[in-house]
A protein has these predicted regions:
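Short, high-confidence coil segments that cap the C-terminus of an alpha-helix
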Residues: 59, 136-139
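Short, hydrophobic/aromatic alpha-helical segments in well-folded domains
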Residues: 107, 126-130, 190
């Protein structure tokens, strides 16, 4: 079953995974709650935030669904999602020691993938969907606050520096481990660190080159395939099982090369 990446619609809010519907780590500033660190209805707050951003700015997310699912995208099970917004619409953004987000950038806040056989490579495809949509809208860059492996040190309150304490203030069940994207993942999909930090670096992906990282890989694979075809003897057969599926059906060599490249990234 193939996967379809499509813009998030407010009508599809109920299809988002439970954590995505209830997490308001980015959308609610704890300072506005006073002594109460819980919301009576976090799902309502999240849906209201999405509605506001969509109304004032436009699409702020992408969702992955099975392309072969019956019914429309709003009824299909959600396999994964990615959310982003202008930094001015993200109350949590100003709390990071590596803030502010650059004036020309949109802030990537959340990405999640449900356990499924087709989940491999899905986070990268979600990022690609977001990048493609933002390029069409003329956005120059996508930035994100990442978390490093060192955040485990912060479990001991004695290790929490003053500039990090505001980041750790959470609402409800939200935590930095669950609600901040891993910095290693971000660098793996092309982001570069523009504001280093031991715990929460800020990273940036330039969009003015389009899907450069993806296009370069595709172009290299095409050149490799063309070279292999030029040097192959006429009528030569491939080794058994080299470009065939387990069922014995032939597989397009170009597709096989692309799949290998994605799996190795």
């Amino acid at each position: 079953v193939s996967v379809r990446i499509a813009p998030l619609r407010l009508e599809g809010f109920e299809q988002l995974p439970k954590h995505a519907r209830r997490c308001v780590f980015w959308e609610v500033d704890p300072a506005t709650l006073g002594r109460d660190d819980h919301l009576s209805d976090p799902e309502f707050e999240k849906e209201a935030w999405l509605s506001m951003v969509m109304l004032e700015w436009g699409c702020c997310g992408q969702v992955a669904t099975p392309s072969a699912a019956a019914g429309g995208a709003d009824e299909s099970p959600c396999l994964g999602y990615v959310l982003y917004a202008p930094p001015r619409a993200v109350p949590r953004a100003h709390r990071f020691p590596t803030a502010p987000v650059s004036a020309d950038a949109v802030l990537l806040t959340s990405i999640g993938v449900e356990p499924a056989p087709m989940a491999d490579g899905l986070p990268r495809e979600l990022i690609a969907g977001a990048v493609e949509e933002l390029i069409r809208r003329g956005v120059r860059a996508l930035e994100a606050f990442g978390r490093t492996a060192a955040v485990g040190d912060l479990l001991d309150p004695r290790n929490v520096p003053p500039d990090v304490a505001p980041v750790l203030e959470a609402v409800g069940d939200c935590t930095v481990e669950h609600c901040i994207i891993e910095a290693d993942f971000l660098t793996g999909v092309g982001f570069t660190v523009v504001a280093p930090h031991r715990y929460f670096p800020r990273l940036r992906l330039e969009l003015d080159k389009g899907l450069g990282w993806k296009a370069e890989v595709e172009a290299a694979l095409e050149r490799l395939l063309e070279s292999a075809q030029l040097h192959a003897p006429v009528g030569a057969s491939a080794p058994a099982g080299s470009v065939s599926s387990r069922s014995g059906a032939a597989v397009d060599p170009a597709a096989q090369l692309r799949l290998s490249a994605v799996e190795s990234c």
